[in-house]
Each structure stands twice: as structure tokens, then as C-alpha cells.
Amino acid sequence: DESGEIYLSWVSQDAEQATLAFARLTSEGWDAAQVISEGRNWFVNWADFPVLSVDSSGMVAHWLQMSATGTYDYEIRARFYAQDKATWTEARTIHTDGISAEHGFVSMLPLNDGTTLISWLDGRETVHSEPPGAMTLRAGIFDKSGANVSEWELDHRVCDCCQTSSAMTENGPIIVYRDRSQQEVRDIYATRLVDGAWTLPQAIHNDNWQIAGCPVNGPSVAAMNKRVAVAWFNAKDDVPKIQLVLSTDSGLSFSEPIVVESPNTNGRVDTTILDSGNIIVSWMDTVGEAKIMLSRYDINGELLSTTEVAGSSPSRRSGFPIIEAVGNSVYVTWTDIDATPQVKVARIDY
């Protein structure tokens, strides 16, 4: 949260049900786990996973729950926790379409008035329209009671199963995601909330990656004041590549891309910014056994260091590593699938 406290959420499963829980890191270690929700009909997925958003006014957490018998008929369920009431709301569905279709790939961003900006991929048009439409990107602002303050469709045609990502700039929120053109070009786009309206989505760089299916590899954005960093994966011409662009004007314009790694990667990126202004990009190295890597850049995009965090696996079960900065330290969390799967956390001090 904004005070520098670290919270970790995870999903555990047994034969009967799935459980979403969280814990807070204290000076003595992790405090007791607290259960947010549990259920027997959840959609638990390696790439589309729950998010916990925390600030001084409270918390928001979501999970995915099956809504019909189709493989990808699932909805986004959420609970909201108001700090002043010290209670969680009843679970609610954050989208109001009532259509059994794919809804997921959520990102959350606390706003300074105690509300939360939630963005998600929404498949209502894929089953509701004739002929079937495409996956859409939607966003809404929710208060701590779970009420929907406002909602928008941000893009009418996006990649079906790549994560969305959001960050707060000095000039307001920015959301990045993988677009999908009529010609099946799936490049990374951004839209910003300016004076109550969302800007026309723009490509952060024209990779012109034409691919007939979803690569399941979303972008990641981090921001500090007017500085914005976006990292993403593409494999145009079958050459895997992670790139990074920087902005000094809250995402209005971006630098030319910096190649973080190519070709020994399968993506799965995340980004964060240290108090020093250094930018950290996490990514997967696929040379030999897979490894979780951190690359550190200065504000001008110069590479300062590359750190191997841990061995991993290229399999889907290992999921997507997540990073968060506190001061000039980075916390990394990932799923270790050796023997019994478990969630691990490491701290790297810079």
C-alpha cells in the first residue's frame, strides 16, 4: 500500500474447493492468513488470477467464478473492505451484463478518494451479438461498498486472454493492454483517464505482430509522478523479445523501445519503479532451466544490472511472477512447482 506495507494473496485448492486468502508482512514475518472467499465452482487459472488491492481506505479482492457450463463462462466476483467499518462486503459481480461469457484479466488501482478503478476483459459481445463480436476492454470505478460509480467500454476489440495493467501517473490513471486489429495484429495499446474521459487508445509502439491466436502474455505498466514504464513481450517473426518504453509526460508519449531480452525468454513480465527512479522489469529466462530475472534501468533507459532471482519452470503451472517496490527494495513472488506447489517470496535490495 502507499505506506510501504506488503500484502500477499494466493489461492489454495483441494478436492472440494478453492480458497482465496491473504497475509501482511510484518517485522516478525507474515501475519496469520485471512480468508477472503472460498467456493466450489471457481475458475482457477495460471494466467488469469485474483488481485488484491490495498490502500489506507481499505481493500478490494476479486476471484473468478463459473457462471455456466461453458469452459470459459466465468464472471468476476469481488469483495470490498472499508477500513473505517472493518468489514468485508458480501461478494458481488462487478460487471452488470448478466451474460455467461469470459470475464477476467483484472487490474486494480486505488484512487485518492477511496474508490478503486478496476479494468477487465469482457466477453459479452462474443456470445451476445450476431455475428459474434470480439473481446472488449471495460473499466469501472467502485466505492468501498462495492457500488459501481461509473463504467466505460474502453476498446471494442482486444486480445482475448492477455493481462491488463494499470498505474497512477501525476496526470491520472493509465491502462495498458494487448489490442487486436481486424488483421490480427496484437500490439500493446494504452488509454488514459483525463478530465473524466478516456483518451482514444494508442499503440505504445508498432511492433506489427500478427498472430492468429492469443499469446497469453500481457503488458505491465508502472508509474511515478510523470514517469511511466511499460514492458511487454512480442514474438514477431518467431523471435521472442521483451521490450521496455519510458515516458516523461504521464504516458502521453513514449521513447523508442529498449530490448530487455531476446530471444531467450517466454515473457511473463512485470514492472515497478524504485524510490531512486530506477525501473525494474521482471521476466522469464528460458536458457536451460527457466529462471526468474530482474533487469534494472535508470531513468534514461540505461541498463544498470541484471539479477537472477530463482529457478523456475517454463510450464504454465509456474504462473506469472509479480513484483512490488518498497523504497529501493523489490519483493518478488512466484509459484514454485517443485514437489508440492508453494508460493515463495524474495526481497532484493538495490
Predicted regions and their residues:
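Extracellular, repeat-based ectodomains that mediate carbohydrate processing or recognition
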Residues: 1-350
